[in-house]
Amino acid sequence: MPKGEPYIPETITVHLGRPDADAMNVEVPFADYIKNVASSEIYPTWPEAALRANIYAIITFALNRIYTEWYRSRGYPFDITDSTQYDQKYTYGREVFENINRLVDEQLNTYIRRQGTIEPLFAAFCNGTTVTCEGLSQWGTVGLAEQGYSPYDILTYYYGDSIDLVQNVPVQTSMQSYPGFPLELGYSGEDVRLLQIQLNRISRNYPAIPKIGEITGS
């Protein structure tokens, strides 16, 4: 279940295989994960606008997996896999490219969302040559960048005009929506505060649910 406003997690847990494969899980800093994926998915020689557009998509895809608890809600002890069949390519132990390292540092606190929503977009992408999809074409971004498209223009070309780039997103420790025990009357603290945020978010779609006036965790 979504956990209030999205944030940039300090770390992400990656499963080094297909979801059901007997493979190792590694917890890595989120920034290092994005740099690794970008260095594994795209080429550092591409135009900067293409690189930036792809990095926005990579960040957003990972945040969507974390925010929706796609794997954890299904009982898996990880946030994302390294399989391009399911997620995006993570190469355990690889070096990253210098310019991609710099661009990720500049863009890390930004993600894509659909206007009118708060959750990170499911920013699907593929290489656009051997594999095509309804989302972003990695090689297609190169041609658009060479035509003078900005990173945002490239993103709207593939994901539509109804997207925003959310900037200055805070970094915090990742927390699952279920604390591991039932909350009871009289409880207070961060778990209660998160539940209050969730209820207020749900009430946007179901107005009959009254909003909690002050989010205090008590």
Indicate where each model-derived feature is located.
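Conserved, single-site charged/polar hotspot
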Residues: 1-218
